[in-house]
Amino acid sequence: MITLESLEMLLSIDENELLDDLVVTLMATPQLAFFFEKYPSLKSALLNDLPHWKETLKQRLRTTQVPPELEREFSCYQRSQSIDNQAFQTRLPAIMDTLNNVESPFLTQASQLITSPERTLGQKVTSGLHALFLQRWRLSLTLQTVSLHQQLMNQEREILLDELQQRLTLSGKLEPILAENENAAGRLWDLSAAQRIQTDPRLLLDFGTFLQRQPALQKLAERLGRSRETKSILTQEAPQEAFRVRVREPATVPEQVSGVHQSDDILRLMPTELVTLGISELEYEFYRRLLEHRLLTYRLQGESWREKVTERPVVHQQNEQQPRGPFIVCVDTSGSMGGFNERCAKAFCLALMRIALADNRRCYIMLFSTGVVKYELTSEDGLEQAIRFLSQSFRGGTDMAACLSALLDKMDDALWHDADAVVISDFIAQRLPDEVVNKVKSRQKQLQHRFHAVAMSDHGKPGIMHIFDHIWRFDTGLKSRLMRRWQHGKAY
């Protein structure tokens, strides 16, 4: 079987010119012209796809087989080119039968050429007539091939136009939410190429509208997303300057058993002391030790952190900005993060996705409660994954240690080794294991990894939050929400 591309090559038909005509016709359609006028930032992104479209169409030509009738006629034409006038005259009846059997458009013209009035019956076929016959036959084959090419391209044009309309409609709706600049518009256009976006994108639009009504949350995401760490160059000067350090010390609020000590706390008596109280000979001994605060009791003690100001030599530095890496965002989906906290956390992730698209970065989401669920919002099917993420419900417990362990494992990947880690939570959770804390501190010290905390509550445990480099606070309490709404309304 011969392909359409091979037939065009054998007939010296320029397929590139035909493909260029198709692209020009496609770009001039009123539907695309309307979208380009409404969303000019998407036009340049679409034009970048033109080479890919042409290559796709060429691949279609390579795989499309010509009809058997046309292939049979072309084979007959090729054999007729390599014979002389006498052999051509001998085979002329067979050629006419072939043209008749394949119902060739050239049949009528061929009959007129061989039965012309100037040619007497039985007269030999001259070289001029032979050349004219082959020339007209080649022209007929060329017209048939071009017609077949046009039919195929028209089908592809309709398919491509339908796909472009769907992508432009989706990209146009999401452009105000996700396209901050030309680079973001281009990446949004690439994301719209996913062929299986089955979920309604209205979730993205709803959270985009919610984010616009929370300018403080959007500003916080901008500050976190645009922040850069610096590389320090040391100098020789080292003056004394005040230095603040967080110091851990025992707290008065009991949290856990930390040992045994002597006291008069009846509620925390050890069982051995209660035994002496039940023996009449030792009862007075029990009361004596009670008065002397010498009863063995459990010691319950908590931890708290305070700032301690000291002075130490500080070396002056010159700072060089480091390039921004991707985001790995851990979102707490426990029951305490439901309601308004849930909407704020999802909108914050949407804002980080917008920044990632604008800065050509990647954005990876990890949801944690009693398990860990993962989404990459900037992958090829990022829009579908973003919609699935926004449709998640927040309920369950809080296993922050498992999420941080999964985050650290992800940062071992070469593609994510310079990522910024962001944890969004109310930080009302159990104490982190020392192993996880030590791993985080090791990465901060040795690899300069950055860990950010976005606190959705003022009641988070300091013992958990102290491991983060930066703590970004967004209070979701009723009073703070009313104050932000009042300030937002006053600004307008």
Swiss-Prot record:
Primary location recorded for the protein, binned into one broad class: cytoplasm
SMART domains: VWA (SM00327)
InterPro entries: Uncharacterised_CoxE (IPR008912), Uncharacterised_ViaA (IPR023481), VWF_A (IPR002035), vWFA_dom_sf (IPR036465)
Keyword Cytoplasm: yes
Record's subcellular location: Cytoplasm
Source domain of life: Bacteria
A single GO cellular-component term on record: cytosol
The UniProt record lists the keyword Cytoplasm: yes
Keywords: Chaperone, Cytoplasm
UniProt similarity note: Belongs to the ViaA family.
PANTHER family registered for this protein in UniProt: PROTEIN VIAA
Self-association and partners: Homodimer. Interacts with RavA.
Function field: Component of the RavA-ViaA chaperone complex, which may act on the membrane to optimize the function of some of the respiratory chains. ViaA stimulates the ATPase activity of RavA.
HAMAP family with a match to the protein in the record: ViaA
Protein name from the UniProt record: Regulatory protein ViaA
